[in-house]
């Protein structure tokens, strides 16, 4: 239900009414016994209330019966997975105090020991063997993986082979990596993959232009494994919660713990001060139709800070939230969570298209802008659902 709500609904508090005026999703709480039943969508506020009710009832049971063999543990929704999910859920629900509470239950006061061993996990693996790295990434005995699922998909072929061509809808291009993500951040000002323990793969040909992280292994046929919840994401979520609550020092401390693990020692600066982060983002332009930048306007975020204010540009709070978004964007590349950050923070997005491959020229077409206030942030329901009498999203 949470996944469906975040695909087919607007972000919580989209219009400042706490989801009370926006469509939710049909919440299936009992067996359906008729063909084409009436599926009222209710409001997004009601959807979130029902998810919270189920979550709070489930957590004590998960804590009580939290007994699994280590090799199968991550294939189950354990208490630890529930804590990580709750941290994400309450951020989206605009309750950062509860997000921090559950992240604390998971991570405690010494989170470094619970993060992925970004250096050790890939030692001895052939750097040219992307699938071997993907297999190591999802390994179910890795304590940093809190929930892994098996699924049918061809996405792993799309990302790991030459099937992601220039300007295809799945491509994370070199231009995007250079000006918004992997090569454009406070720890790395050049096009260099060596700063990362989990080094990305780079294709920079005219017809195959992409940068990708090997996360979904190719198993047999169209089956793969996806990591749904990790301690690393939970730590960055806790950092966001702390910053939104006004604890800038605490949020920065969590981010420094993560960068120390994620970046290679000796090749990249791995910890930063609040002053350094603010200076870095102060010097960047905001992204618009003519400028690519990791720095986005956040003033339309669909939540208030701890003091009831909106995000003010040029403040330390804004700079640290920009940094949180950048860290999470890089950590969760290819996982779909960036779209949720775009929705929650009301970020305007621009679709850059290559117009001259030889000159490496890009532009944003007239229809290439999606404003943070656009109703299309709620994806249209498929025709099959409409035939089943479920109300379509407004446009």
Model-derived features with residue positions:
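C-terminal functional modules
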Residues: 303-395
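Aromatic-anchored glycine-rich loop motif in surface-exposed flexible loops
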Residues: 1-64, 68
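Structural register within alpha-helical repeat arrays
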Residues: 4, 79, 86, 231, ...
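Hydrophobic-face positions in mid-chain alpha helices that act as interaction patches
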Residues: 38, 94, 100-232, 264-310, ...
């Amino acid at each position: 239900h949470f996944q469906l709500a975040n695909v087919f609904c607007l972000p919580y508090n989209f219009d400042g009414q706490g989801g009370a005026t926006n469509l939710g999703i049909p919440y299936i709480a009992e067996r359906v016994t008729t063909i084409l039943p009436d599926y009222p969508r209710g409001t997004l506020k009601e959807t979130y209330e029902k998810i919270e009710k189920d979550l709070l009832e489930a957590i004590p049971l998960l804590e009580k019966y939290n007994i699994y063999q280590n090799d199968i543990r991550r294939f189950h929704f354990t208490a630890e997975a529930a804590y990580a999910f709750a941290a994400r859920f309450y951020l989206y629900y605009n309750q950062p105090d509860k997000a921090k509470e559950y992240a604390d239950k998971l991570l405690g006061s010494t989170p470094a020991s619970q993060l992925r061993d970004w250096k050790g996990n890939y030692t001895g693996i052939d750097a040219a063997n992307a699938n071997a790295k993907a297999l190591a990434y999802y390994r179910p005995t890795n304590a940093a993986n809190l929930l892994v699922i098996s699924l049918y998909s061809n996405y792993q072929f799309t990302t790991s082979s030459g099937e992601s061509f220039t300007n295809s809808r799945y491509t994370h291009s070199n231009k995007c990596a250079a000006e918004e993500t992997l090569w454009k951040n406070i720890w790395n000002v050049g096009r260099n993959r060596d700063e990362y323990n989990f080094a990305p793969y780079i294709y920079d040909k005219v017809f195959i232009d992409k940068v990708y992280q090997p996360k979904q292994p190719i198993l047999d046929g169209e089956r793969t494994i996806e990591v749904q919840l990790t301690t690393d994401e939970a730590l960055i979520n806790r950092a966001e919660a702390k910053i939104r609550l006004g604890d800038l020092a605490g949020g920065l401390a969590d981010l420094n713990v993560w960068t120390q693990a994620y970046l290679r020692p000796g090749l990249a600066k791995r910890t930063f001060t609040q002053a350094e982060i603010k200076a870095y983002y102060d010097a960047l332009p905001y992204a618009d139709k003519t400028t690519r930048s990791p720095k986005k306007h956040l003033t339309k975020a669909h939540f208030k800070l701890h003091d009831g204010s909106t995000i003010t540009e040029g403040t330390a709070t804004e700079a640290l939230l920009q940094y949180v978004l950048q860290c999470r964007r890089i950590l969760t590349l290819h996982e779909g969570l960036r779209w949720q950050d775009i929705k929650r923070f009301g970020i305007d997005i621009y679709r850059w298209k290559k117009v001259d491959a030889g000159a490496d020229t890009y532009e944003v077409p007239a229809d290439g802008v999606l404003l943070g206030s656009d109703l299309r942030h709620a994806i249209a329901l498929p025709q099959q659902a409409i035939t089943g009498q479920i109300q379509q999203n407004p446009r």
